[in-house]
């Protein structure tokens, strides 16, 4: 049997507020989108006695043997949802790690979706929710890779056919540790996204919002602050925001030409930064 090929799209937080904390995790609300930057996953059943997981590509270095994919498969086996099947999985990594683009979580989400679609597993709604939480807090967002509002009570509302825009995604040579950034959160916001609507995805509305983790990451890493400032100066027709806990900074544009022009200027000034033009999907 040949491999099935899956595109695992990068997640972007168009806006994010930290609204509180329970015993283990911070509570957040977020307006989430996905962009045309993706990892490629090849998956097939194997006669091997163990799952075989491998990573290749530019961002495959330093991925631990215990990763989101191995975690997912272990959870499915512990819950006895997947029995008598082993898989060979190859992931070609195009999404940088420690960037706030959710690469690992989206890999797990897309494999989970594939296993359900191909009827290898048939979890109940409750089981699916539990699996996602056990693998990682972003995993549930990746099950449908569409514009989504995550409410502060962890409920998800998805929206179709929102207006698309262009994103210049920029990442310096360093990453941000999610744990370190969240551990520095001192203030919480009042929930603002508990009545989700499609209007929230309008360019003008998104411009007014922010990512409450950004100030922490920018104060820890002055280079990030400089990058954001440079992108903001480059065009008054965009808005610029960190995604997740960083270190990727995203400039959003309505026009591809403007996005491409800013990329050219940025690449000349910041030669050691990775940057990519993408479109929301």
Q: Where in the sequence are the language-model features?
A:
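Short beta-strand scaffold segments in enzyme catalytic cores
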Residues: 16, 39-43, 140-142, 148, ...
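A generic local secondary-structure boundary/capping motif
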Residues: 30-32, 129, 139, 155-160
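Conserved, helical-rich catalytic subdomain that frames metal- and/or nucleotide-binding sites
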Residues: 51-53, 144, 148-239, 252-272, ...
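ATP-binding N-lobe of GHMP and related small-molecule kinases
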Residues: 1-99, 116-127, 171
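Contiguous, small/hydrophobic- and glycine-enriched helical/loop subdomains that border
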Residues: 112-152
């Amino acid at each position: 049997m040949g491999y099935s090929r899956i595109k695992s799209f990068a997640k972007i937080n168009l806006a994010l507020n930290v609204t509180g904390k329970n015993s283990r995790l911070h509570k957040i609300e977020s307006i989430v989108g996905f962009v045309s930057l993706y990892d490629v996953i090849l998956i097939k059943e194997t006669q091997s006695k163990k799952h075989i997981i491998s990573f290749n590509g530019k961002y495959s270095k330093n991925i631990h043997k215990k990763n989101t994919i191995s975690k997912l498969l272990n959870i499915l086996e512990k819950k006895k949802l997947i029995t008598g099947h082993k898989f060979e999985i190859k992931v070609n990594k195009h999404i940088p790690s420690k960037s706030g683009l959710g690469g690992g979580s989206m890999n797990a989400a897309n494999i989970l979706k594939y296993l359900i679609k191909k009827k290898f597993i048939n979890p109940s709604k409750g089981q699916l929710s539990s699996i996602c939480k056990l693998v990682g807090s972003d995993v549930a967002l990746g099950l449908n890779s569409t514009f989504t509002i995550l409410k502060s009570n962890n409920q998800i509302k998805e929206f179709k056919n929102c207006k698309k825009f262009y994103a210049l995604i920029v990442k310096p040579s360093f990453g941000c540790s999610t744990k370190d950034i969240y551990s520095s959160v001192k203030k919480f916001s009042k929930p603002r996204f508990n009545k989700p609507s499609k209007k929230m995805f309008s360019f003008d509305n998104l411009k007014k919002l922010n990512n409450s983790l950004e100030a922490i990451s920018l104060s820890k890493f002055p280079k990030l602050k400089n990058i954001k400032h440079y992108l903001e100066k480059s065009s008054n027709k965009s808005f610029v925001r960190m995604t997740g806990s960083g270190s990727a900074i995203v400039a959003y544009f309505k026009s591809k030409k403007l996005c491409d022009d800013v990329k050219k200027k940025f690449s000349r000034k910041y030669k050691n930064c990775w940057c990519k033009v993408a479109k929301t999907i």
